């Protein structure tokens, strides 16, 4: 079995590179067809109300993501102030979106900041694990519903057909059902993974995870939908976002640069919206959801680092009570 590991790692690298090359080719093909003058015209003429609404949804999305770590606070029972938890979550999420691949840098950022604030490594691991689980539970639930009901219309030349996507949707919903069943009825609620003790949450806690994460994914989809001028069905846009997110995980490109654009251009090709509108919406989305929060996160990170010793002492006194 051990001998197969190097081959499997090599196969994964080859498949990842093939997928990456396919995305690049797809992006180049569509980029050559785009009327870039139309793109800049759309950006210049953006409706102010739509932009302000999109900004509001960005704030809502980041607050919802911060709730993942508040759930972690409840789950672990640590006593860090809620505002500190939200600030750490914001900084790590903004860094992760733009600078990392598949959460690697986010985990390092969380360990750095939470440990500076006085939390032990075992607690930080549980917080990070719960955050990742919460994020993907919302994805799995929404993806299961959207893929099962065939809301996403795949082009004829796509890598999988709609039947396969429906089967995937059913599998995702089964995963949700199994998770809820274990949370509600499992007698053995403690498990150890890589030396870390994990406890199954209650079914009510699991429902809270799904509700918060689903709301976050829906807010992200609504941002793009608003920036596209609401010309495409909202749930179709959300479904395309879900497809592009999993494609970004496969390719391992920081911020999913190029992947998001390639998937949206491919899947929205048959809709009544121009490629210029799609590109303009995604550029605006990247500025609002990635770039501006990253700048704010850098400032917040410096503030946290400068005040870490004072905050740690205060937190240790609170945890000692």
Residue ranges and their predicted role:
Residues 1-90, 148-249, 275, 280-282, ...:
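Predominantly cytoplasmic-facing regulatory/coupling regions of multi-pass membrane proteins
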Residues 83-87, 102-106, 116-133, 273-284:
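Membrane-interface alpha-helices at helix entry/exit sites of multi-pass transporters
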Residues 91-100, 242-261:
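Transmembrane alpha-helix interface/packing and boundary motifs in multi-pass membrane proteins
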Residues 95, 99, 124-144, 247, ...:
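Membrane-embedded alpha-helical segments of transport systems
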Residues 104-116, 145, 254-269, 283:
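Re-entrant/interfacial helical elements at transmembrane boundaries that shape
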Residues 116, 120-157, 163:
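Hydrophobic alpha-helical segments and helix pairs
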